[in-house]
């Protein structure tokens, strides 16, 4: 019975027309009890195998998320400039991508990557603004653009047993137009979209006189700053960070044993940070962790 037109069993007065809003037009509405979406999306890809070791492709694709209902529908800002809609519409994305997959240097280097542009229309966003309602609600808050470059590689240098691997992404995001309250500001970054993220690892393996295989590995992970939301009262800056992991061990066909140290510098890297309900809530990565790992292959 938790339907839009009647609010909720515990607090029907939140949504019930004629009780909350005081707006005769809104109070007269017959609020829907379901959200529906329909339409057609497409995807097209062209690829070119320049050689057995090099392939290029271009992709055009579309996507969407279905609409949803809002519990506090009809509630407004004090000046009446914004009113929560009963239904949040679908948001849509159009993606343009050029990419490549390569095997180079006689198989010693594999490098894949892509350049992409994404057009976002009517981005669905969850909003908490006590000046409007003491409940979360959603709206199509903004139009936005995303431009990026990403890639990954594996490289085997002329040192037996050594492998170097990594991945990276570069992002440029921007809210082009605010479609909702003044809580969303054009020109700002999208949430959880650091300008740069990267990781690189080096692993060295060697044969032992016992017939086992020894290994040692180091990894460095880094991220640029980002923001936790596009809603100004709820957002927080998440600082850039970097941290390292190391591990060493012995293995054979039947088992693997290793010691590891994750987050050697005990970095408090923030992965979530917001001010919802006017209380800052921060989530960080695990602190420095030292452990032993043993795995048996059956």
For the regions a protein language model found, what residue spans apply to each?
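Surface-exposed extracellular loop regions of Gram-negative outer-membrane beta-barrel proteins
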Residues: 1-21, 25, 37-51, 55-65, ...
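Solvent-exposed loop segments that connect transmembrane elements
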Residues: 3-35, 68-87, 125-139, 175-188, ...
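Short sequence motifs at beta-strands and strand-loop junctions characteristic
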Residues: 32-40, 89-92, 141-147, 190-197, ...
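Residues on the lipid-exposed face of transmembrane beta-strands in outer-membrane beta-barrel proteins
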Residues: 36, 44-48, 98-102, 151-155, ...
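Outer-membrane beta-barrel strand-turn architecture
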Residues: 40, 48-52, 92, 102-106, ...
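Membrane-embedded beta-barrel scaffold of Gram-negative outer-membrane proteins
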Residues: 49-62, 67, 87-149, 154, ...
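Gram-negative outer-membrane beta-barrel transporters
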Residues: 108-119, 137-231, 293-297
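C-terminal beta-signal and adjacent terminal beta-strands/loops
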Residues: 119, 158, 221-231, 250-298
């Amino acid at each position: 019975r938790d339907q839009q037109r009647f609010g909720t069993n515990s607090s029907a007065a939140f949504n019930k027309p004629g009780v909350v809003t005081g707006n005769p037009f809104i109070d007269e509405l017959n609020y829907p009890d379901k959200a529906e979406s329909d339409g057609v999306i497409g995807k097209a890809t062209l690829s070119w195998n320049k050689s057995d070791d090099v392939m290029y492709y271009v992709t055009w694709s579309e996507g969407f998320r279905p609409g949803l209902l809002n519990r506090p529908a009809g509630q407004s800002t004090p000046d009446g400039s914004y009113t929560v809609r009963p239904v949040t519409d679908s948001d849509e994305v159009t993606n343009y991508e050029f990419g490549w997959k390569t095997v180079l240097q006689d198989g010693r280097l594999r490098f894949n990557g892509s350049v992409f542009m994404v057009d976002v229309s009517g981005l669905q966003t969850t909003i908490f603004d006590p000046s409007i309602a003491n409940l979360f609600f959603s709206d199509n808050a903004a139009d936005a653009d995303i431009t990026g470059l990403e890639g990954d590689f594996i490289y085997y240098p002329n040192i037996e047993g050594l492998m170097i691997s990594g991945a990276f992404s570069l992002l440029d995001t921007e809210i082009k137009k605010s479609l909702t309250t003044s809580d969303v500001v054009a020109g700002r970054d999208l949430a959880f979209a650091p300008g740069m993220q990267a990781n690189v690892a080096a692993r060295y393996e060697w044969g032992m006189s016992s017939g086992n295989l020894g290994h040692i590995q180091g990894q460095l992970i880094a991220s640029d700053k980002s923001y936790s939301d596009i809603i100004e009262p709820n957002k927080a800056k998440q600082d850039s960070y970097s941290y390292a992991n190391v591990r060493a061990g012995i293995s054979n066909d039947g088992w693997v044993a290793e010691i590891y140290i994750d987050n050697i510098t005990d970095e408090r890297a923030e992965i979530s940070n917001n001010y919802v309900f006017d209380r800052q809530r921060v989530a960080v990565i695990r602190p420095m962790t030292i452990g032993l790992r043993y795995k048996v292959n059956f």
